[in-house]
Regions:
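Membrane-proximal linker segments that couple transmembrane helices to downstream signaling/catalytic modules
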Residues: 1-3, 151-160
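Hydrophobic pocket-lining residues within nucleotide cofactor-binding pockets
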Residues: 16, 109, 134
Length: 160
């Protein structure tokens, strides 16, 4: 768990039972990444509304993965079926047109909390969501793939 937190660029918490994106946790030294990966949005807010707004930035090729985690009902169903974590990866188009790869990891748990509205303890499903910018890893993978393809093409040309 500590390793996941250290690798994360952004962490935020969501009450999946009530559809509330509660807060963003900014890690020391990751303030810039946090601003890049997390939209400027007033908190607390509806998690689903936040995701739908963010979805406008997601590329068509990767939107299916993003949509697996874009609302509380889907995540609660996964949790009720025994899943406690899941990861998806998607591409977000930045304002300057560049593409950023993002890995989103959702860690879910059930907690009993005191509800001040009804003045009683109630079970809630919470998620800690971790975002990691994986653009550099994808660029390295693409460069390695191109290098291997060039070596393969050269080897094929020599064998003719």
């Amino acid at each position: 768990m500590d390793a996941l937190l250290e690798l994360s660029d952004v962490i935020y918490t969501v009450n999946l039972t009530k559809d509330v994106l509660e807060r963003r946790i900014v890690l020391n030294g990751k303030e810039q990444k946090s601003r890049e990966l997390f939209m400027d949005y007033p908190l607390p807010c509806s998690y689903q509304d936040y995701c739908w707004e963010y979805e406008k930035k997601i590329t068509q090729e990767t939107i299916a993965g993003y949509c697996m985690t874009d609302n509380c009902e889907k995540l609660r169903k996964r949790f009720e079926n025994g899943e406690t974590n899941m990861s998806v990866e998607y591409c977000a188009r930045e304002d300057d047109g560049s593409i950023r790869w993002v890995q989103k990891t959702v860690l879910m748990t059930r907690m009993v909390v005191f509800d001040t509205e009804i003045l009683a303890e109630v079970p809630m499903i919470y998620a800690i969501i971790l975002l990691q910018d994986t653009t550099q890893r994808h660029e390295r993978d693409e460069q390695e793939q191109a290098r291997l393809q060039a070596a393969f093409n050269e080897m094929r040309a020599e064998s003719r």
